[in-house]
């Protein structure tokens, strides 16, 4: 692939279109410096831009990468004459030669994706979890006392938020509010049904679902769990479970609806008098993959991703990896630093549904190399080094032994690690000066390399920016 030839081709086509470098850059949402580098043969557009660059230059992607126009039939949206004789002309075969010293080897990891563990990327996206606000984060509704996204059942039940079942793991240092709650429901009259429900559950006919609920009660209680229409009159399926007690107990039933409904209700009720505390609720398709949707996992596999970055993105600045060592129901929600980003999706909170083990399982399933972003603002260098050890250490190390005890004997051997995300911008917490970030990144990177020498570390910062290049990228060159 001749970068110089491609660059000259881009330059000729741009001028033929009557565009300046700045105008082309604006259309592609890149910097004019990036366009200049393409035209000088110093780099190529990102692979995700190939189609857009070709469209702006009124050429095909094949022509763009070959650096020359070809005798092919063009779509009517390409402002070129069409040589049309009733049959499509045969495209000229394209041969790429690596005989130019300026050519670059294309990395097998060129095509990747950023899996940000937040918003609709997870809820209604990758996560198979069907219940919204399943751990009752945030303030309750003003009039009813029921958690947001839930509605009360029964005429005389009393609702209040109570001491939580959820909690954060070790290494949690962030300052957030209303992340951990449970819902307490008092029924003053035996024989009268009380409970809680949620609208807007999408169910498929004949599809089995796994329901789970963590409760604490004054005595053994018979719970009835139903999937119904929005009115509650048409019951698609129903199951009961008896349990409870002074300690938190997880109750489980399987539900298989006899009809499909894109706006079904999940309803949980009981008739025992007394107090019931609900710590978490879960509803998953029985065929889920580590808590993830099978159809989305298969689609990711079909994409052919070769590297997958997680947990972000901006969310990496909220994430505490040690929370993932807790059971999924017990992991506390995260209140977003930028609530405006998550408010339309999950009311300002994110729910820690996927942990490190799940992410590695996903990467192996789709054939992608894992690329993990640490949280250098809220986790210490030792805590981030422990994450590396959990992934790459053998059973002789404390965290390698912990991974093995959790059912994963062999190290994950995660090679690629990002030292934070987008430092230098106001939407990320922490020291956003070049020198300040550099110091944090150095401290974390050195500890991580002690835990697993030979890692490929990626530093963060705004690009292009001379100050960051001088006072951050250069000093970090020894480790990243």
Identify the meaning behind each predicted range.
Residues 279, 409-427, 461, 469-480:
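Aromatic- and acid-rich polysaccharide-binding/catalytic face
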Residues 271, 311-312, 397-433:
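Active-site groove signature of glycoside hydrolases
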Residues 48-63:
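DNA major-groove recognition helix of helix-turn-helix/homeodomain DNA-binding modules
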Residues 28-44, 66-69:
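Recognition helix of helix-turn-helix/homeodomain-like DNA-binding domains
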Residues 1-16:
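A short, Lys/Arg-rich alpha-helix, primarily the initiator
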Residues 60, 78-352, 369, 385, ...:
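Extracellular and organelle-lumenal recognition/adhesion modules and their flexible linkers in secreted
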Residues 18-37, 52:
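Short alpha-helical DNA-recognition segment
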Residues 264-268, 272, 433-480:
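Noncatalytic carbohydrate-binding groove/subsite architecture in carbohydrate-active enzymes
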């Amino acid at each position: 692939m001749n970068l110089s030839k491609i660059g000259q081709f881009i330059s000729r086509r741009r001028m033929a279109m009557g565009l300046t470098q700045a105008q082309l850059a604006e259309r592609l949402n890149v910097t004019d410096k990036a366009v200049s580098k393409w035209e000088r043969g110093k780099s190529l557009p990102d692979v995700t831009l190939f189609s857009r660059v070709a469209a702006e230059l009124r050429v095909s992607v094949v022509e763009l990468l070959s650096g020359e126009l070809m005798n092919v039939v063009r779509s009517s949206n390409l402002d070129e004459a069409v040589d049309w004789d009733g049959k499509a002309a045969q495209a000229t075969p394209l041969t790429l030669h690596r005989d130019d010293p300026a050519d670059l080897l294309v990395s097998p990891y060129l095509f990747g994706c950023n899996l940000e563990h937040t918003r609709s990327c997870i809820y209604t996206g990758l996560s198979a979890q069907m219940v919204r606000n399943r751990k009752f984060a945030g303030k309750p509704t003003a009039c009813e006392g029921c958690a947001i996204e839930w509605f009360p059942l029964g005429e005389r039940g009393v609702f209040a938020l109570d001491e939580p079942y959820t909690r954060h793991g070790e290494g949690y240092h962030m300052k957030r509010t209303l992340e951990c709650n449970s819902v307490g429901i008092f029924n003053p009259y035996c024989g009268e049904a009380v409970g809680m429900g949620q609208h807007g559950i999408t169910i498929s006919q004949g599809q089995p679902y796994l329901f789970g609920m963590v409760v604490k009660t004054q005595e053994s209680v018979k719970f009835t769990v139903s999937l119904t229409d929005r009115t509650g009159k048409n019951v698609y399926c129903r199951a009961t479970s008896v349990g409870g007690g002074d300690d938190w107990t997880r109750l489980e039933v399987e539900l298989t609806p006899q009809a499909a409904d894109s706006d079904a209700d999940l309803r949980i009720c009981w008739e025992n008098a007394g107090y019931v505390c609900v710590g978490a609720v879960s509803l998953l398709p029985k065929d889920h993959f580590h808590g993830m949707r099978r159809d989305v996992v298969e689609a990711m596999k079909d994409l052919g991703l070769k590297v997958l970055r997680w947990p972000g993105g901006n969310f990496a600045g909220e994430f505490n990896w040690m929370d993932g060592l807790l059971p999924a129901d017990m992991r506390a929600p995260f209140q977003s630093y930028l609530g405006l980003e998550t408010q339309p999706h999950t009311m300002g909170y994110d729910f820690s549904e996927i942990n490190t083990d799940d992410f590695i399982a996903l990467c192996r399933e789709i054939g992608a190399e894992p690329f993990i972003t640490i949280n250098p603002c809220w986790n210490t260098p030792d805590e981030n080094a422990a994450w590396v050890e959990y992934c790459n250490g053998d059973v002789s190390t404390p965290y390698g032994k912990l991974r093995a005890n959790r059912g994963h004997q062999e190290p994950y051997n995660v090679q690629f690690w990002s030292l934070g995300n987008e430092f230098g911008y106001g939407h990320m917490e922490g020291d956003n000066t070049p020198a300040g970030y550099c110091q944090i990144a150095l401290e974390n990177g050195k500890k991580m390399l002690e835990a697993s020498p030979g890692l490929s570390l990626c530093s963060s910062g705004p690009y292009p920016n001379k100050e960051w290049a001088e006072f951050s990228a250069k000093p970090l060159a020894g480790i990243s």
